[in-house]
């Protein structure tokens, strides 16, 4: 585990300090949950220089539009993961996909279980893909609401919302404000 910096951004220097010859894989979330911060392409490229596999979890990609998937053709040690849980409403069905260099994909295909997607998940996935235009229009509505909510939260005394690229907003409450809201 690598602590993020005071702005909840990825701390590359801290990640490098934790890296040693036993480190084989590093997971990075982008957008990060609960902060909604994006890992920059330059930060990911810097991590890719280390002798390990970098997995970037882009579960909230559809809400951010920010991705490092284009780097997979350049870096054999990069895996980008996506899920249908958030934008397509398939949480709990364990349906997603990975974007990676063909060499890694071939290796993973050799070691994966033969039936790695359940029937319910597959059926839901196919139905979702048939109506992806509708689902993506819902994503746009959520993005609009996120912006509206962020603006409203900025006007509440004692509440400091953090900008987010996810479908959520992290808020900081002034002292005892969280207790007041809880009792509310």
Predicted features and spans:
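PLP-dependent aminotransferase class I/II
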Residues: 77-155, 159-162
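Structured helix-beta-strand junction loops
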Residues: 21-22, 50-51, 74-75, 111, ...
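Short glycine-rich anion-binding loops that position phosphate/pyrophosphate groups of nucleotides
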Residues: 31-34, 86, 167
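Conserved PLP-binding catalytic core of the aspartate aminotransferase-like
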Residues: 142-143, 155-184
